[in-house]
UniProtKB/Swiss-Prot annotation:
Protein name, UniProt field: RNA-directed DNA polymerase from mobile element jockey
Temperature dependence: Optimum temperature is 26 degrees Celsius.
Lineage: Eukaryota, Metazoa, Ecdysozoa, Arthropoda, Hexapoda
InterPro entries from the UniProt entry: DNA/RNA_pol_sf, Endo/exonu/phosph_ase_sf, Endo/exonuclease/phosphatase, RdDP_mobile_element, RT_dom
Annotated gene: pol
Reaction equations catalysed: DNA(n) + a 2'-deoxyribonucleoside 5'-triphosphate = DNA(n+1) + diphosphate
Miscellaneous information on this protein: Prefers poly(rC) and poly(rA) as template and activated DNA is not effective.
EC numbers on record: 2.7.7.49
Superkingdom of origin: Eukaryota
Record has Cytoplasm as a keyword: no
Disulfide bridge map: none
Molecular functions (GO terms): RNA-directed DNA polymerase activity
Amino acid sequence: MTQPTLKIGLWNARGLTRGSEELRIFLSDHDIDVMLTTETHMRVGQRIYLPGYLMYHAHHPSGNSRGGSAVIIKSRLCHSPLTPISTNDRQIARVHLQTSVGTVTVAAVYLPPAERWIVDDFKSMFAALGNKFIAGGDYNAKHAWWGNPRSCPRGKMLQEVIAHGQYQVLATGEPTFYSYNPLLTPSALDFFITCGYGMGRLDVQTLQELSSDHLPILAVLHATPLKKPQRVRLLAHNADINIFKTHLEQLSEVNMQILEAVDIDNATSLFMSKLSEAAQLAAPRNRHEVEAFRPLQLPSSILALLRLKRRVRKEYARTGDPRMQQIHSRLANCLHKALARRKQAQIDTFLDNLGADASTNYSLWRITKRFKAQPTPKSAIKNPSGGWCRTSLEKTEVFANNLEQRFTPYNYAPESLCRQVEEYLESPFQMSLPLSAVTLEEVKNLIAKLPLKKAPGEDLLDNRTIRLLPDQALQFLALIFNSVLDVGYFPKAWKSASIIMIHKTGKTPTDVDSYRPTSLLPSLGKIMERLILNRLLTCKDVTKAIPKFQFGFRLQHGTPEQLHRVVNFALEAMENKEYAVGAFLDIQQAFDRVWHPGLLYKAKRLFPPQLYLVVKSFLEERTFHVSVDGYKSSIKPIAAGVPQGSVLGPTLYSVFASDMPTHTPVTEVDEEDVLIATYADDTAVLTKSKSILAATSGLQEYLDAFQQWAENWNVRINAEKCANVTFANRTGSCPGVSLNGRLIRHHQAYKYLGITLDRKLTFSRHITNIQQAFRTKVARMSWLIAPRNKLSLGCKVNIYKSILAPCLFYGLQVYGIAAKSHLNKIRILQAKTLRRISGAPWYMRTRDIERDLKVPKLGDKLQNIAQKYMERLNVHPNSLARKLGTAAVVNADPRTRVKRRLKRHHPHDLPNLVLT
């Protein structure tokens, strides 16, 4: 049995983008674990794709295509990137790699030749790498210790540092740099410097491969690199379904009485154990790990070129004949062109086979999904003490400790209210009717609607497996569900969340607060939550308690209706020569900090007793752990908040916020001159008056009442992120409003629910933002929609309609009232994109392109969207939304109807608007 090894390559690429395909062959042929590259000549944001590998860069500080280094590492290895060192005199990319002999820092080092180095510079550089490292790179230092006939000043300084014995040089003793200038002597510039490893553990050799004036070096460390644990599912994809179902049919023979909480936990445990047994019996007998890296299959012509180039390279290294160097350069160019043609042919074949239907397994949408989200490389995380997390396991603990603090309630509520809440929660219930029983048919209907592409929770039970359960298993499951409702106890196994952290775009990746938690909950628990929610929504007290101005988490409600309310209110103020003063409030960590006693206090007043007990059990004793690269943190408690990712969570938050202040506290203006608009935790409050002082006073009255409500229920408002906007055609702005003594910053425009609302509601800033976002998205999809590629025209049009166009038309039923000069910018974006997609010549008219591609013109699109929107408003379940529809406007009392003074459109005018 061969000893496990870690293979580390080193290469000065002189430009990595040109040699990426040849590097891919090199990585495959030698099964390289870590590749250290220098002189990558890559700009910030520039990427190359190497399947199965991750790349961490240290760019030149100028941002230009010069210098730079990169660590290319197998994605399945346990590693943690460190902050790169990027200055004019050094570019060092580094990662922490976990091996069987401990964690080692692997660094790619490039030291430009023009900079002067002294002994202290080398000492500080090595100190930054730690006590155990392997640093390979182009040091531009010559000395006899690593194979140079002559020494340079930098080489002498480096040799002086190494001579103390703490560091060792790992080199082949052969030249690695063969200049294109025949007058320059070959020299050894590329080598490794190690610390903390005995030389007996390391082997090194020079390879006559890759196209550059530097030869690659391969070092072998006799240690086993640790691999990330693989996340598996309970039932394998190629399992025998018949065996799985047959074994579960035995659940019909289980005779189990469930009378109390312990029985429910035992029944849940029994059900999962039976599922695990069935999955193991159904698993394929010859299960083996599929190797992720296979040698590339290359055509014979390219293999011949590779062999010939290597022979010529060896001959040139042996003889130094300039003619051999010229032949090698020509062969390298031929190889580069051949690899480029092969890559383009592969892309053409791939694009030609893409499709948007089931016959191609929806391959078009699979590939576009990969490019819709901006890729975020892994980053090092700072721990609370200011140091760096060296391993993925350390990351999990740092994230978990941070979340544990976040899942803790604030302490603002007065003691008198806390006592009142506590006393009420301990008071006895009133008599009520029993809940409707869960039937087998109800369970089947819920399971049939489960989405298949959802990650499983801690129990590894995914929705695909649940859909395969036989009736006997579903009957046992229905028994558990009914017991949960009868006993009023939510199983403990369904209250554990596995959390993964997702980086927030634009935030510092090294900060632990720059990551958003995403919870993976047990699927069976989610089904139980849906059953509870269905029964909650039939309670009239619950539906009445949630205010009408809350448009979030409600059926047949969306962001356009709430935006329409805000815009319509401001437009009416402008028509009446009034000021509309608005405050857009930011509730800090609204869902994570929900005060459980306060939520239960409100729930007990509204919910039937049995549902209240289940919800109470649902919130109590919840736990979580954080998962990073397959490693799990210790289990932490959740003391506050509604479970993120749960089915019940949104409705519970709506109940918690249901008693927030309405227009009642406002006395400075009339009731109809106050607008409250909430969508989930996004809250907007507007007041209007002919007097800017009266409108401001009315808004301040509401904010004072809202601040008092927030303190009573342990809610924190972040005044720094709140915004104050004045909507008016007149001069003058709100003199200022405050929250908890802090002045809210006044803005000329604010982005609310994805639409930028400016002072005069021209939507010019919003359309400018649309242009920027659309161009970015088009650039990301450019390789798919380019006119010369092999992707069919129909697929390109599908990409435009399904992925690109929604960026243009979101909220069109509201911002469509903008001036034609602004809307024309949207029309131009569509015209340019369609012309690019179709490859139409310059003389072809845009309207002909739109007709041939069956893409509606902007005016037709606007009318169609507005017409459907108005039809929906006319029959909307919410009376606040129905007031916005054309039917309500036409049938309104003429005495109360707003007189149209300004020459501008309102949203209900859009169905009849004609754009030329």
